[in-house]
Amino acid sequence: MPVITLPDGSKREFANPVSTLDVAADIGPGLAKACIAGRVNGELKDACDIIETDSELSIITAKDEEGVEILRHSCAHLLGHAIKQLFPETKMAIGPVIDNGFYYDIDLDHKLTQEDIDALEKRMAALAKTNYAVDKRVVSWQEARDTFEARGEDYKMAILDENIPKDSTPALYHHEEYIDMCRGPHVPNMKFCQNFKLMSVAGAYWRGNSDNKMLQRVYGTAWADKKALKVHLNRLEEAAKRDHRKIGKQLDLYHMQEEAPGMVFWHNDGWSLFLELEKFIRQKLGQYTYQEVKGPLMMDRVLWERSGHWDKYSDAMFTTSSENREYAIKPMNCPGHVQIFNQGLKSYRDLPLRMAEFGCCHRNEPSGSLHGLMRVRGFTQDDAHIFCTEEQVQQEVSACIRMVYDTYATFGFSNIVVKLSTRPEKRIGDDDMWDRAEEALKKALKANDIEFEILPGEGAFYGPKIEFTLHDCLDRAWQCGTVQLDYALPGRLGATYVAEDNSRQTPVMIHRAILGSLERFLGILIEEYAGKFPAWLSPVQVVVMNITDKQSDYVDNVVNLFKEHGIRATKDLRNEKIGFKIREHTLRRVPYLLVVGDQEMENNEVAVRTREGVDLGKMQLEEFATKLKNQISLRSLNLLED
């Protein structure tokens, strides 16, 4: 007679084994109708799974985040059901849940078109509308294999052969005539899978290996109700308008081309953005007392072997050879920084030593994963490494945290999620060392009043890590900042310092990044601001326009004055109507549009308007220059107001 303990502490006793659905029905018909799955003793289970012993149970509905993930997973099965009905010759591969949705990889000779995607979505809706029940059957490994062999599902057989032990009992989910295999859980009825949309189709290699066959990957999104789906689709529509690749082309910031995949060709205005961002970070480095260094672009393979990177990253490293020596272009800066640290004897009095670099790194990312500025092969890291004693770890990490938040605040990012990854099973050092390291990070976070989530076992083998994920105006998550303790690399590369007792000790190394890469962060900023950069960051801060040729010399004088003040100004003396000029520069997102006619010229004034169309009226030239210069120096996010 199992006794079921619910989240509120109440208990229910049953005469026979029960399922989550049975318990929900015992509580009330409304909950039974809403029940998607259950969390039994901390483990997600299908609503139909039998509970035989005393257990703690949480009933999962579509109101729960886990419930939405489950219905998304079931929508992947629904997609498979529709695909097999419309394209029976398809071989099904995998269909997992992803952020906000799902996908299914399929092997189909016919290349899916938008018309096919529309037809699949229509068929999915028709199937879901019947509210058919999903039948879960737990079978032997051999029965599962026989089932998929009879259906010609080569990929399902490969999963069984290569990933599932023969003594296991896989779960087969029957969607009417369609059968899929999954660890679950899934919805008990397709009534929960009514609010979805198929988004796109792309190529994907089987098992992510380019040596394998290219499959077609159909993406979809699914939500608990129509309102949530509509909000998501509207957000995607807004994201498409803000796409940094589209805006980058409109504003002539950069381009990429086939001859240099994943490498950025910065144009004048884009490079201005890059340099301004670099300048800002460089000022932060000075504020937080960092040295700035510059290491070589490539180093001998032997060094990468000693550092351990060759074993882990060699597939992602670009290599070359010269005079019978093999070199690797650096994918990261840390080994080079240890080489700089190793030059000359270091004392405990020299620590902490904070070393930063705008390091040009390269990684041979798969071509299919490249995405504008967000995923590139050549990038610049705002990378730093702090060499310190173990006693200094907490204060140094605390300073890193302050620097991260100071930096993000300048760009208007305040919604930051922080996660602390702790010791994995396979790790160096003893538990005492890990206890001290993890406690130092926790204390540093708490000292800065930072709420954080702990990810048990997710740290690197050489030390725990803090990750900073910022959320943009569309509530998209971007993992940018990291603070990683490293107890391994300094020792591998022979870094030591003379301790107070004259013994040689190995320093702790703190890897610190704030932006991650400048390229990716600029992509984030382009989309966050929709190309309307704050004045301090804008490639062109002011454009000065004349009404007639009579004001041309005055316009030249105005622009020259701005440049003397360090303001990035340009002029537009074209023989066009002023309304046309204003519209054009508004579309180019120039923060301030200045118009001068005869009256402004006579009074040494400018007529000021913003790109948002706000008329700030006439100002004395020096007055406006001073106000703008002050706004730029403060790195204000807002434009001047009337």
UniProtKB/Swiss-Prot annotation:
SUPFAM superfamilies: Class II aaRS ABD-related, Class II aaRS and biotin synthetases, TGS-like, ThrRS/AlaRS common domain. One of its GO terms (biological process) is threonyl-tRNA aminoacylation. It comes from the Bacteria. Its main location: cytoplasm. It comes from Shewanella halifaxensis (strain HAW-EB4). Homodimer. InterPro entries: aa-tRNA-synt_IIb, aa-tRNA-synth_II, aa-tRNA-synth_II/BPL/LPL, Anticodon-bd, Anticodon-bd_dom_sf, Beta-grasp_dom_sf, TGS, TGS-like. Signal peptide: none annotated. Belongs to the class-II aminoacyl-tRNA synthetase family. GO terms for molecular function: ATP binding; metal ion binding; threonine-tRNA ligase activity; tRNA binding. The gene is thrS. Zn(2+) binds at residues 334, 385, 511. Residues 243-534 are annotated as: Catalytic. This is Threonine--tRNA ligase.
